[in-house]
Amino acid sequence: MNGLNEVNNKPLKKTRKPINVSWIWDVLIIVVLLIGAWFRFTGLDWDTGYHLHPDERFLTMVETAIRPVEHLSDYFSTSTSTLNPNNLGYTFYVYGTLPIFIVRYVGEWLGQTGYDQIHLVGRAVSGAFDLGTILFIFLIGRKLYKNSKLGLLAALFSAMAVLQIQISHYFTVDNVANFFAYAAIYVAVCIMMAESKPHNPDQEPVFIPLWKRLFLSGGHIGKYLVFGALFGLALASKVSIYALAALLPLAAVIYYSKLPKDTRGNESLLIWRNLVLAGILAFIVFRICQPYAFLGPGFFDIKINQAWIASLKELATISSGEVDVPYALQWARRPITFALENLVKWGLGIPLGILGFFGFLWMGWRTIKGDWQKHLLIWGWTAFILITQSMNWVRSMRYLLPLYPAMCLIASWAIFKLWENGAGAVRKITTLHVNWRRLLAVIAAVVTIAGSAGWALAFTNIYTKPVTRVAASEWIYENISGAIRLPIAGEDGKTVHQSLAYQNTATLSMDQPYVYGFIAQADEELTGVTLEHVLFSYSLDQTASYPA
C-alpha cells in the first residue's frame, strides 16, 4: 500500500503539445523565390548588346521612340500621344501597351532609356513578373488543395521550368500577361472555395427589397472586382489571353453548385450582379491600360480604333497560315503533337514534362469521375490552352507559356495524390513490406526535382558564356582582315584588331573624305590604320592598283 501511495503522490507529467511547424512551408517559399531569381537574373546581358531576339529588338526600338506624355490629357489622345507607337512610325503594333508603359517609366526612373539600356530594364521587369507568377502558383496550390507543401513543390517546379527561365531573359510582354493571369486565377480559386453565410432553417424568412439586395449585399463582390481588374490588366498586356475571362463564371458556377438549395435563389442574383460589375471594371482597366485600342481623345470617347483592329486581323491572318511570310514557313507540316512534344522535352524537361502530362490525364479522369468541383478550373484552363495552341498554325513554345505554371501545379498534385492513395496500400516483396504507391511518389518527387534542377542549371549555363554566334563573329573580326583594319594596343601588350566596313564604290580624296562612325572595342591607343587594298586613280582612263 505504501508503494501504491508513493505512486499516487507523484506529480503528473504535463503532456507536451505537439509543436506546429506548418509555418515552415510558407517561409520556404522565400527560398524557392531566391532559386527562381538566380535562374532568371543570371546573365541578363547574354547577347552583350547585339539585340539578337527579333521581337525584343522591335520592342526595344518602340521603347526608345515613345516617351511620357507631357500632360495627362494627352494620354488618351490616340492621334497625338507620344506613348502611342503608331504615332512614331510603328504602325503595326499588336502587343499590349501596359508592359511597354511599365518598362518605359521604370527606365525613366533609372535613367536607362537608351537603345543599349532599355532592353535590359525590360528583361529585369520580365523576370520580376515571372517571380510573381511563381508566388501565385504557390498560393493557388495552398488554397485549392489546402496543402502548403503541395503549393511549395509546384512553385519549385515553376522556378526551374526552363521555358519560364528563357522567357525571363527576353524583354517581351508574355511574363507580364502571365503574372496577371495567375493572380486572377488565384482570385477565381478564392471565389469557388468561398463559404456562404450559414442558413438557419428555423429562422423566419425576412423580406429584403430587390434594390437592397443588389446594392447593399456583399456576396463576395470584392473578389469579383479584383478578378475584373486583373483580367483588364492581363488583356492590356496581351490580348490573346482573352480566354481568362471564362474562369470567373466557371468559378461562380462551382461556388453555386456547393450552396444549399434553399439559399441558391438569393445567391444567384448576387452572382449575376458581381459578374456584370466585374466585366465593367475589366473594361475600365483595359481602357486605361490599352488606351490606343480606342480613338479618344478623351477617356469617355470609347469608339474602337479600326487601325488597331486591322493590325489584329492581319496578325490573325499571318498566324493562320493563310498568307505566306518567310518566318511562318517553319510551321508547315508540323504534327498536332508538336507543341506538346516541345513542352515535355524542352520547355519543362523530360522528368517534369512526363509527370505533368501524366498528372493532367489523371486529373482529367478524376474530374470525369465526379471530383470536378476541385479540379475543373485548373484542368480546364490547361486543356483549353493545350488544345487551341496545338491546333493553331503557329505552334511556338512561347504560346504555351500560360499553361506552364498550371502544369507544374498538376505535377505536384500528382505526387501528393499518389502519396495519399498509398495509405494502407502495403505489398509484401520477399521479406519486406513495401508501400509501393508511397515509394513511387517519393521516387517521382526525387527524380523530377533532380532532373528539373539539372536541366535548369544546364540551360542557365548558356547565359554565363558568350553566345556562339557572337563569339564566332568576334573571332572573324579579330582574325580575318576587313576593308579597314584598326590595330588597338592595350596596356597589357596585347593588340586588338578591329575591322570596319567600307563601301566598295566609295572614293577617297582630299575633297571627299570617307566618314564612318564606330565604337572602339577597347579604350586604348590606336597604333595605325590598315587599308587592305586601294585603287588610286591617276587619269581619266587608267588606274593603278597599290597594296596598302
Predicted regions and their residues:
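Transmembrane-lumen/periplasm boundary regions of multi-pass, lipid-linked membrane glycan transferases
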Residues: 59-74, 78-81, 85-114, 118, ...
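Membrane-interface alpha helices of multi-pass inner-membrane proteins
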Residues: 210-238, 340-342, 385-390
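Signature aromatic-anchored transmembrane alpha helix within multi-pass, membrane-resident enzymes
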Residues: 30, 409, 414-457
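Transmembrane-helix motifs of polytopic, lipid-linked glycan transferases
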Residues: 124-145, 183-187, 358-360, 364
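Perimembrane helix-loop-helix junctions
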Residues: 6, 187-219, 230-231, 244-283, ...
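Short helix- or helix-capping micro-motifs
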Residues: 36, 154-159, 186, 231, ...
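Hydrophobic/aromatic-rich transmembrane helices and adjacent perimembrane loops
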Residues: 167-168, 174-178, 234, 239, ...
